[in-house]
């Protein structure tokens, strides 16, 4: 019996391993796996259903069909275990060996493995240095290849056609050896001397100069070295033995009616075996060559189809015209082994049901239907019934539960007490999509959910379903309670704001309760306290909104924890006094002494959490919810059609707009504006009119006239239900009310362009047929978009998770002094994100100095919490250098100090926290939300009127950056530079406002001049881009030939003519090479030079430009020579946004990127070619100049003689992140990506902490390219993991050798995921075949560092609670590797001995 137990134990024990290696299998290895050769294509006997001998399901090879029973039935039962039956040859053992025993097929002719042949770049082709086409022709028996040239003039690896081969045979006889088919390739591979080849190539590499050749050689060297180091033999890429998958992994299942359902693999194997047997027979018969060849080709094709069907030629189809699923298809794709079974599995002990609202639940509870609980907790109930002696056996317990006896319900209650369950709502977009609750048994069949967690789940009660999971083990329950309980997840991991925030009705109730009303019943009472206020209200002596005086005692707790009491009589309302009763002690009364909208409530909970901690906040949140619901019901806020008050001014606003539009129409007809300008102006007029109507409507809705106690009429905030809902943030928004009571406004077509006739009606007035039809456009687009975009957003999240999954906090401090500079985000006249919000929760990288002094305000390595941020604000600090994950020096993972505060917990981050996944979820989750947002507005085009001026808001002085300008005739400045920035500086030298000033803008004030608030400092036309001259003189047309490069358009009505430049695409042959331009000449006809340069003033005109001047006209500096109509901008929403975010994270190069200066120096222009200019930058120190050819149509931002810094913009356009990294460094590219991504989310009002984006950027920057290898084993131009380069360099530095120099690479997230060190992680992401082929050839080891690899091999992940387990394993491994000679004194030894002896007791022997 004992050895039986030992045997069973051995069955369950898994091998301890630290890494997984993948390599090519040699024929001997395949044979060693195999339990026998499969010789026949038969599967099972159709009469007896027993497997055929030597067939694909043979019991002798693969094991018995029934447990411990041989096929003929001679040996049965356990006592014969291990006996091999002499009659049928089957070993008596468990059936499950049929899942692990493999067979093999001896191939009659070698066959190439299609993965190494066709997966690009072809490994066989690269190794032999032959083109893939040639190899394929040899393999599929179309041509010969020379294997040994001998003494002839034939080269090895030379391809011969049939005729050439016969000629050579005649000429040389058997001097040479040429073959066809896989044997030939196998022979070539076998004869290769890898090491010698490697030496040769390395010599060649040092000699060549051409870049392409170097690249090719490096690739070959890497492949050859991989073969040498991994111990793989090249000839193993050609199969001589084919392994056969265990039969239970390709089952054959009998269906009723005598038919069978079979795995496609059986068909594919059958094909291989049939062809192989036929080939053997033909070879035995010595059949004619052509027949044998054909059979060999067919065998090759059959093996190809088995390994990867459809990779070459047409896919082999089954009986139902569907391609058969080959081995490669089994592992790749969403339904493949990796993503279907290894990364996510279905679980038992789970159920799902519809959710309904549970407003009486506490935050940590959920309502679980009794029926469901009974089913989910069955085993626990059985156990309890037996324990109590109420049931003797499990069977009896089962019967009791089935009968649903009364005692069962009592026991269910006991079992469920304190046993948390997990609730999950699909799609689980971030970690708050699964939370733990304590179940409360309820009648009915729907799960009840606490309303406050709806925001985290993004759940609503319109039919959503949720799944329930039961954590079974004690550890799982502990984790669920400590980490996943809904009460522990109050703050959102994306931005650190509370996510358990009242919304909808609760907000309405609290808002209604805290509003005040003029002359309400009971105004002016003086009450002794909140309790009395409540009594007065309940007795009906005072209204909820009455303004009264109440005596309030506050217990104010500062963040340091000091408590001060103060009592005072405060002017407030009855409702606020009642609400004060549920506010926890420690918060000031001022927090509720205001009308509470959604923002105020969120701030209130946040303050509560920061000052009082978790428990009071949870209780407070619950109380606010109950109170909110109660008073929302009391308020009786309802919506009637009369609540949608249409403003009286609406008609006149629309009339004015219509007049303006008519005016523009006239201008268009008289040729003053182009069609595009007209369209844009019309749209702007209507957008502005819409804004005005909306403003009038909101003013109308938001106030009402009332009579106060003294009989005087005064205005108060309105109690209109619709207004209250929008104002509190409970339901609806100004944009939606505008559609109800203002005008619907402009609508968008499905392609995003705006229809220029707006819908002037609103929903209260009703739409006519045309208006209704126009609006259906937008509404349907919204629905279609949502369906398409949700998938895109999900895919973005998946890529982000994949690239960041192995980033974990691994140490406390890496000790770096580097960091990134944080400044407030200022856009236009408003601070979009103040400094405090950006640095809160970060660690300072340097001491922060008090401005204007030398005092240290904040020391280095301080975690900036709320008080520190207050201090920074008080001292008006403008810039802080904080630690960032991008500059963290930890090798694998990051350190806690570089990350800073754990946003969801509010303290510094713990070791083992999976920050990568959190970052990915935080960025990806809103993406999906945003795609859903669009259809709720119903297609109304949200587009701001185009900006045409800059109006400053504050007092201060102007500062212009990167500016060039000329004075025009009126003494105004005209801007001629393209990325000019205008800043407003206050008296402390802080930037208050910041604006972009476009080219051609006219400035009213210059650099350094003082302005007062509200002053307009710049004007421009938003719809055209002017061409401004910098010099005075006369116009001379160049290359402007009517009919070839330009057309004249004369207006019939006015007789005015304008010249339009043709787009180069529309020009005829001779016009294509001409460059239309305007030159400026002086009175003598000499070219006028641009001041400060020796370049003639000439302005190239891009296509579609309109010139309204004639040849020879006199002009002055600053005049507009021509206009280029700007394309209309479409609607602004996240559609533009999500793909933009994806582009940024994929680090895509924009189409026509900005050209940046490669080095610092002085600009000059060299010799021009036909279509390009030569830009020369000469460094100031006199070293070599840098030259670049730039197309002439690119607008240059620099002039001759100007000094530029490396990385400055030379020619405008969208910047390429790769250029920014190369020229300005890591921090600049981080800043660029962070700001651009934040821009998109900010537009939608979504807050994401910068940290998360930085985490992704760090992962994008994890590779470097070796510039010079030094003494390392790297190759020049090789791409390697930064951590590997750093470790290698540290080692070399310690030994005093030459280190490698490298440049950082920016990889897009898809590329970065596929380029990870771990092949398991990459293979389970995308392009599985390619990744595995590459890994196998190189014999890669996967160290199982990331999360994904560990999930796939079935271990705890090295993060969170699994972090300790992995640290422990690492320590054990190091201890076993390094034998230490202990140096101990005798006393210590005896003490230790005693300790060991004592500790030895009570330990199990397997620990």
Curated annotation (Swiss-Prot):
| Chain sites annotated for binding Zn(2+) 1 | 70, 72, 85, 88
Q: In Gene Ontology terms, what is one molecular function of this protein? A: DNA-directed RNA polymerase activity
Cofactor, how bound (note):
Binds 1 Mg(2+) ion per subunit. Binds 2 Zn(2+) ions per subunit.
The regions listed as transmembrane in this protein's record are none
Names of required cofactors = Mg(2+); Zn(2+)
List ligand-binding residues for Mg(2+): 460, 462, 464
Biological process GO terms, please? DNA-templated transcription
**List of residues binding Zn(2+) 2:** 814, 888, 895, 898
Q: SMART domains per the record?
A: RPOLA_N (SM00663)
Keywords, comma-separated and alphabetical:
DNA-directed RNA polymerase, Magnesium, Metal-binding, Nucleotidyltransferase, Transcription, Transferase, Zinc
Q: Which domain of life is it from?
A: Bacteria
GO annotations of cellular component type: DNA-directed RNA polymerase complex
NCBIfam families, per database record:
rpoC_TIGR
Q: What does the annotation say about its assembly with partners?
A: The RNAP catalytic core consists of 2 alpha, 1 beta, 1 beta' and 1 omega subunit. When a sigma factor is associated with the core the holoenzyme is formed, which can initiate transcription.
Q: What does this protein do?
A: DNA-dependent RNA polymerase catalyzes the transcription of DNA into RNA using the four ribonucleoside triphosphates as substrates.
* Family annotation (HAMAP family): RNApol_bact_RpoC
**Similarity annotation:** Belongs to the RNA polymerase beta' chain family.
User: Which protein are we looking at?
Assistant: DNA-directed RNA polymerase subunit beta'
- Which species is listed as the source? Pectobacterium atrosepticum (strain SCRI 1043 / ATCC BAA-672) (Erwinia carotovora subsp. atroseptica)
């Amino acid at each position: 019996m004992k050895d039986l137990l030992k045997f069973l134990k051995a069955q369950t024990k898994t091998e301890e391993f630290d890494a997984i290696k993948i390599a090519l299998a040699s024929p001997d290895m395949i044979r060693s796996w195999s339990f026998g050769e499969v010789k026949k294509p038969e599967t099972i006997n159709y009469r007896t259903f027993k497997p055929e001998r030597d067939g694909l399901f043979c019991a002798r090879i693969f094991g018995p069909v029934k447990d411990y029973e041989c096929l003929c039935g001679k040996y049965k039962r356990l006592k014969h275990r291990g006996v091999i039956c002499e009659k049928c040859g089957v070993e008596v053992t468990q059936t499950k060996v049929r899942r692990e025993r493999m067979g093999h097929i001896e191939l009659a002719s070698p066959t190439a493995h299609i993965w190494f042949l066709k997966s690009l770049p072809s490994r066989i082709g690269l190794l032999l240095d032959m083109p893939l086409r040639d190899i394929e022709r040899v393999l599929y028996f179309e041509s010969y290849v020379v294997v040994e040239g001998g003494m002839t003039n034939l080269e090895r690896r030379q391809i011969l056609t049939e005729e050439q081969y016969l000629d050579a045979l005649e000429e040389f006889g058997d001097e040479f050896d040429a073959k066809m088919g896989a044997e030939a390739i196998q022979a070539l591979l076998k004869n290769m001397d890898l090491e010698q080849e490697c030496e040769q190539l390395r010599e060649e590499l040092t000699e060549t100069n051409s870049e392409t050749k170097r690249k090719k050689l490096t690739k070959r060297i890497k492949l050859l070295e991989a073969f040498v180091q991994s111990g793989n033999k090249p000839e193993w890429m050609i199969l001589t033995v084919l392994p056969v998958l265990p039969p239970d992994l390709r089952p054959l299942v009998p269906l009723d009616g005598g038919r069978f359902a079979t795995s496609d693999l059986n068909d594919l194997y059958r094909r291989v075996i049939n062809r192989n047997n036929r080939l053997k027979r033909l070879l035995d018969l010595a059949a004619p060559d052509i027949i044998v060849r054909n059979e060999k080709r067919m065998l090759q094709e059959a093996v190809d189809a088995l390994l990867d069907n459809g990779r070459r030629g047409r896919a082999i189809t089954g009986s139902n015209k569907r391609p058969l699923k080959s081995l490669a298809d089994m592992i790749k794709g969403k339904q493949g082994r990796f993503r279907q079974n290894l990364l996510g599995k279905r679980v038992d002990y789970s159920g799902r049901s519809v959710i309904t609202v549970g407003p009486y639940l506490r935050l940590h509870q959920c309502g679980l239907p009794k029926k469901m609980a009974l089913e989910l907790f069955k085993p626990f109930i059985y156990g309890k019934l037996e324990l109590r002696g109420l049931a003797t056996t499990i069977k009896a317990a089962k019967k009791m539960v089935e009968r649903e006896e009364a005692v069962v319900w009592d026991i269910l209650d006991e079992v469920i007490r304190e046993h948390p369950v997990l609730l999950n709502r699909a799609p689980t977009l971030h970690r708050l999509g699964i939370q733990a609750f304590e179940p409360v048994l309820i009648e009915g069949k729907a799960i009840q959910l606490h309303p406050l967690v709806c925001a985290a789940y993004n759940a609503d009660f319109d039919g959503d379903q949720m799944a329930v999971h039961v954590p079974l083990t004690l550890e799982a329950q502990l984790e669920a309670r400590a980490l996943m309980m809904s009460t522990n997840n109050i703050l959102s991991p994306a931005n650190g704001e509370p996510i358990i925030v009242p919304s909808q009705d609760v907000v309405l109730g609290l808002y209604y309760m805290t509003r005040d009303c003029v002359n309400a019943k009971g105004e002016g009472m003086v009450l002794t306290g909140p309790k009395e206020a409540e009594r007065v209200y309940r007795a009906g002596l005072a209204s909820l909104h009455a303004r009264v005086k109440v005596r309030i005692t506050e217990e104010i707790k500062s963040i340091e924890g000091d408590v001060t009491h103060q009592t005072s009589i405060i002017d407030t309302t009855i409702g606020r006094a009642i609400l004060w009763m549920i506010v926890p002690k420690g918060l000031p009364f001022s927090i509720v002494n205001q009308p509470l909208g959604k923002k105020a409530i969120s701030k209130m909970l946040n303050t509560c959490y920061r000052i009082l901690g978790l428990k009071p906040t949870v209780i407070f949140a619950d109380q606010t919810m109950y109170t909110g619901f109660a008073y929302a019901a009391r308020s009786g806020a309802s919506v009637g059609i009369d609540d949608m008050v249409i403003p009286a001014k609406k008609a006149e606003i629309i009339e004015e707009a219509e007049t303006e539009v008519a005016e523009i129409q006239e201008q268009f007809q008289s040729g003053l504006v182009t069609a595009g300008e007209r369209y844009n102006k019309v749209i702007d007029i209507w957008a502005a009119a819409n804004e005005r109507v909306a403003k009038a409507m909101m003013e109308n809705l938001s106030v009402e006239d009332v009579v106060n106690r003294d009989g005087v009429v005064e205005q108060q905030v309105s109690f209109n239900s619709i207004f209250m809902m929008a104002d509190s943030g409970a339901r609806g928004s100004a944009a939606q009310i505008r559609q109800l009571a203002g005008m619907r406004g402009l609508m968008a077509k499905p392609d995003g362009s705006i229809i220029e006739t707006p819908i002037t009606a609103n929903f209260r007035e009703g739409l006519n047929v045309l208006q209704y039809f126009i609006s259906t456009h937008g509404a349907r687009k919204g629905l279609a978009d949502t369906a398409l975009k949700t998938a895109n957003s999900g895919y973005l999240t998946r890529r982000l998770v994949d690239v960041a999954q192995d980033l974990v906090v691994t140490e406390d401090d890496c000790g770096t002094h580097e960091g990134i500079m944080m400044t407030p985000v200022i856009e236009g006249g408003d601070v979009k994100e103040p400094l405090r919000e950006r640095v809160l929760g970060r660690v300072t990288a340097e001491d922060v100095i008090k401005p204007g002094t030398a005092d240290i305000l904040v020391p280095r390595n301080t975690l900036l919490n709320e008080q520190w941020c207050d201090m920074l604000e008080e001292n008006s600090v403008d810039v802080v250098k904080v630690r960032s994950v991008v500059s963290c020096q930890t090798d694998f993972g990051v350190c806690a100090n570089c990350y800073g505060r754990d946003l969801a917990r509010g303290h510094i981050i713990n070791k083992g926290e999976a920050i990568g996944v959190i970052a990915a979820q935080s960025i990806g989750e809103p993406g999906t939300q945003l795609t859903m947002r669009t259809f709720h507005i119903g297609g109304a085009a949200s587009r701001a009127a185009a900006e045409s001026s800059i109006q400053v808001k504050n007092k201060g002085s102007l500062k212009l950056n990167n500016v060039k300008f000329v004075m025009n005739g009126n003494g105004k400045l005209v801007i001629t530079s393209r990325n000019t920035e205008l800043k407003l500086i206050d008296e402390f030298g802080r930037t208050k406002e910041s604006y972009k000033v476009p080219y051609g803008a006219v400035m009213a004030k210059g650099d350094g001049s003082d302005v007062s608030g509200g002053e307009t400092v710049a004007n421009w036309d938003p719809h055209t881009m002017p061409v401004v001259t910098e010099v005075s003189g006369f116009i001379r047309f160049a290359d402007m030939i009517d009919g070839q490069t330009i057309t004249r358009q004369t207006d019939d009505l006015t007789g005015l003519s304008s010249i339009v430049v043709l787009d180069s695409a529309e020009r005829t042959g001779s016009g294509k090479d001409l460059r239309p331009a305007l030159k400026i000449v002086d009175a003598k006809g000499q070219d006028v030079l641009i001041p400060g340069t020796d370049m003639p003033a000439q302005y190239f005109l891009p296509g579609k430009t309109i010139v309204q001047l004639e040849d020879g006209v006199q002009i002055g500096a600053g005049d507009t020579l021509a206009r280029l109509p700007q394309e209309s901008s479409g609607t602004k929403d996240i559609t533009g946004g999500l793909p933009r975010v994806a582009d940024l994270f994929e680090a895509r190069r924009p189409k026509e990127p900005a050209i940046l200066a490669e080095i610092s120096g002085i600009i000059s222009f060299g010799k021009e070619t036909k279509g390009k200019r030569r830009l020369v930058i000469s460094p100031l120190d006199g070293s070599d100049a840098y030259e670049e050819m730039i197309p002439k149509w690119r607008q240059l931002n620099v002039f001759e003689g100007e000094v530029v810094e490396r990385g400055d913009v030379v020619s405008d356009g969208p910047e390429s992140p790769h250029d920014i990294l190369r020229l300005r460094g890591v921090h600049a590219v981080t800043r660029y990506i962070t700001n651009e991504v934040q821009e998109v989310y900010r537009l939608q009002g979504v807050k994401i902490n910068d940290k998360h984006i930085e985490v992704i950027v760090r992962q994008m920057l994890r590779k470097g390219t070796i510039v010079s290898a030094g003494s390392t084993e790297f190759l020049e131009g090789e791409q390697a993991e930064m951590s590997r380069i750093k470790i290698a360099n540290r080692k070399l530095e310690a030994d005093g050798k030459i280190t490698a120099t490298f440049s950082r690479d920016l990889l897009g997230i898809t590329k970065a995921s596929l380029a990870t060190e771990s092949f398991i992680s990459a293979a389970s992401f995308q392009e599985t075949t390619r990744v595995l082929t590459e890994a196998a050839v190189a014999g890669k080891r996967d160290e199982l560092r990331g999360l994904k690899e560990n999930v796939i091999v079935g271990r705890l992940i090295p993060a969170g609670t699994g972090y300790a387990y992995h640290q422990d394993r690492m320590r054990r491994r190091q201890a076993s590797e390094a034998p230490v000679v202990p140096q101990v004194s005798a006393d210590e030894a005896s003490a230790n001995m005693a300790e060991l002896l004592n500790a030895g007791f009570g330990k199990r022997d397997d620990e």
